[in-house]
């Protein structure tokens, strides 16, 4: 089996509105730089342990940095804790979901262009030249989907989203395991 036997969905021609994928790491570094230029203090390598939202005064954030608990006060709080979901858990904003999934992702240096995965000219010419490279490509099968996203930084984002009832998280929860998982499930 090669890539040309897979189902392909998406536009055959470029869309009238130009767009591109944002490299999240590049964006985050840029935002960090802008924040520091505005005089904000950014504490990398810290872990928030508690947030107190105080309606009539500055909010209080407790965090651990270098094994020491510290506190700061601030006017605004934005939860960027990822899966820890500090504010969502504290204020019980979570809602039960019927669909459960886990995800892993990473970036590879360099460009992955799925057009290069076959020499079949009829498949390559089915879409406007370069269109697959400008797209988020998803490979789907029972209980999972895998993405390949070319980034403006000339790197590629790869990710796996899977139902734990079909693909236990422990089988792909590290880079090394994810590569082995792909060899079994997506040998293309």
Tell what function each PLM region has:
Residues 1-47:
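Conserved N-terminal/central alpha/beta ligand/cofactor-binding core
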Residues 34-187:
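Predominantly flavin-linked oxidoreductase catalytic cores and closely associated redox partners
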